């Protein structure tokens, strides 16, 4: 469901990474490497928010380069700082996301929002929300539509213990039918998600997890 080949990125004269390859189907994969290694840059490339210098990404079998609309239609992306439009409410964001995915804000998503403790926050504007509340809004959006890939940058950051427990359940459920690819330094969270842990050293050659 998530595949990338020969990804490289540099800023000016600094090489962030080069020649990265990976191929994985349903399941949780946690990217854990040292600070400054390029984890957020890689996740942004996989989500299509920045471009790689070389290489290609496929989401749900769709090329992010040549079929961007189709690729992004099967993607949920949760950046580290989940700021949508500052004056947009959480409910408006979720309704817009549902519309983009040809679905509606259904009882499943609203139940997840409630479990995240968002009942009193859905009608607040993003600029009024805390860091953790914004993140929970974005994570709730992962249940909307028929997405195949979830990419998340430090998804447990800013969440309290009860929200982390909800997130673990969410990721384990999503991983039954989708790829959940996230970065995290939190070994306990990664273990609770039953995620496979990889580093950049594991991305230097094709690693096939489809078996």
Please give the residue ranges for each predicted region.
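A short, flexible loop at the N-terminus of ABC-type nucleotide-binding domains that lies
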Residues: 1-26, 68
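Helix-to-loop junction immediately C-terminal to a conserved catalytic motif
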Residues: 47
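Conserved ABC transporter NBD signature motif
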Residues: 55-66, 70-71
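Q-loop/switch helix immediately C-terminal to the Walker
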Residues: 81, 86-102
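Conserved ABC ATPase "signature" region
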Residues: 95, 106-121
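Hydrophobic anchor residue at the start of the ABC signature
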Residues: 139-140
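ABC ATPase C-loop
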Residues: 143-144
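Catalytic Walker B motif of ABC-type/P-loop ATPase nucleotide-binding domains
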Residues: 150-154
């Amino acid at each position: 469901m998530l595949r990338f080949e020969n990804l490289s990125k540099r800023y000016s004269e600094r090489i962030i990474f080069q020649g990265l390859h990976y191929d994985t189907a349903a399941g949780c994969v946690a990217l854990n490497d040292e600070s400054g290694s390029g984890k957020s840059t890689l996740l942004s490339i996989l989500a299509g928010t920045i471009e790689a210098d070389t290489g290609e990404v496929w989401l749900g079998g769709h090329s992010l380069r040549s079929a961007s609309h189709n690729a992004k239609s099967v993607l949920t992306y949760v950046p580290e700082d989940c700021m949508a439009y500052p004056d947009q409410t959480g409910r408006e964001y979720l309704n817009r996301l549902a519309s983009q995915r040809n679905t509606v804000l259904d009882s499943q998503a609203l139940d997840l929002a409630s479990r995240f403790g968002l009942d009193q926050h859905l009608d607040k504007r993003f600029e009024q929300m805390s860091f953790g509340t914004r993140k929970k809004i974005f994570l709730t959006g992962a249940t909307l539509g028929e997405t195949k890939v979830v990419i998340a940058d430090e998804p447990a950051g800013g969440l309290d213990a009860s929200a982390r427990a909800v997130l673990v359940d969410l990721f384990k459920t999503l991983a039954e039918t989708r790829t959940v690819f996230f970065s995290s330094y939190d070994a306990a969270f990664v273990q609770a998600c039953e995620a496979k842990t990889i580093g950049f050293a594991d991305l230097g050659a094709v690693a096939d997890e489809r078996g």
